[in-house]
Amino acid sequence: MSRTSIILVLAIFVAIAAIAQCRNIQYDVDEISPEAAFRYAQWGEIPHKRVPSAGDMMVRFGKRSV
């Protein structure tokens, strides 16, 4: 077998494994909130940064006093 065919076979194997894994993701449809219904259990809680308001940024950069 040539080098290209070996790489092609490995790429196909990885693609099949990825498709099989994504089909095994378990999710809860019975969640109360609509946004929680699309959150997968394996992912857990993703920490979110707080976005500062325009007033916070004005205070930070000296455009407005507290």
Curated annotation (Swiss-Prot):
Function: FMRFamides and FMRFamide-like peptides are neuropeptides.
Family statement: Belongs to the FARP (FMRFamide related peptide) family.
Annotated localization: Secreted
Top-level taxon: Eukaryota
One Gene Ontology CC term in the entry: extracellular region
Propeptide positions: 23-48, 65-66
Protein name: FMRFamide-like neuropeptides 24
GO biological process, one term: neuropeptide signaling pathway
Signal sequence residues: 1-22
Phenylalanine amide found at: 61
Keyword Manganese annotated: no
Keywords from the named record: Amidation, Cleavage on pair of basic residues, Neuropeptide, Secreted, Signal
